A protein has these predicted regions:
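HIT superfamily nucleotide-processing domains
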Residues: 1-191
Length: 191
């Protein structure tokens, strides 16, 4: 359904009428669209303007593929525009489901707000994270996670997908097994 919306509505409307509807934003040169998710008042999806199934696609590791996580971070302003006032970066999360945890076969990154309990927990443990993948102490909401600190330069230059693939043993061959999430830390880095 998502790919049909992108390919049959958003892209044609942008190209023919300079109107991204039903998407919020279409950036053909940069290779992405932003679409209002039907769930939640401030939840959006950033999707490629090309057909890419998900995190398991080899395309996400190709250096010529747009850096979708960096683009999603830059697109976070759509939430504040809809809300009518600024939203603190520490309240925003980006997330992509694993191949097995999603219902759509078009790569999409969720742009939404963190649950307050998650924000509080990450604030407690965030300062302890380094630039290597490590387990989140005690997990989060009953699940085990790995985390690492990412600088803005790393996000822009390498992107979240390549950082995952190069940072964990055998991850490159098992990308579909992973979900990824990202939020800002108070010092400007990401977790």
């Amino acid at each position: 359904a998502l790919w049909r919306i992108v390919s049959q509505q958003c892209l044609p409307n942008q190209q023919a009428h300079d109107n991204p509807a039903p998407c919020t934003q279409v950036d053909v040169p940069a290779g992405f669209v932003v679409f209002k998710d039907r769930n939640g008042p401030l939840q959006y999806l950033l999707m490629p303007s090309a057909k890419i199934t998900g995190i398991e696609s080899p395309a996400v590791l190709d250096a010529t593929t747009p850096n979708f996580f960096a683009q999603a971070w830059r697109a976070r302003h759509v939430m504040a525009e809809r809300y009518g006032k600024p939203i603190d970066d520490g309240d925003i999360s980006l997330a992509i489901n694993s191949e097995y945890g999603r219902t759509q076969n078009q790569l999409h990154i969720h742009i939404s707000c963190l649950l307050p309990a998650v924000k509080q927990r990450l604030a407690q443990i965030g300062p302890d994270f380094i630039d290597q993948w490590q387990p989140l102490p005690g997990g989060l909401l009953g699940h085990d996670y790995l985390g690492r600190r990412v600088t803005p330069a790393e996000l822009e230059q390498q992107g979240a997908f390549r950082l995952l693939a190069s940072g964990l043993p055998r991850a490159e061959r098992r990308m579909g097994s992973f979900g990824l999430a990202m939020t800002a830390l108070p010092d400007g880095d990401f977790l």
